[in-house]
């Protein structure tokens, strides 16, 4: 079991049933780990605002925690408005943001 699989197993054990995702290449291990979890459903969104808004709505309507999976800092920036709304509404939401591989850090990519 790798770290991504352990994280997804922990989320499932905590009652998380859905992950709203807009992943990039840096989150592929997490995507693969979600795919292995029979208890978690992955929903792909084509924009981070859609992903975070859907997770907020899901959490408000079901009173169950949802997970978002976003791509790097720009992905987080695109989803921040809805994450702010979710926080203000006390929506049960867990946000995961990927990061560059260590060997890519020297390029200082966004």
Feature map (PLM): residue ranges:
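N-terminal alpha/beta PP-like core and its mobile active-site loop of ThDP/TPP-dependent enzymes
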Residues: 1-110
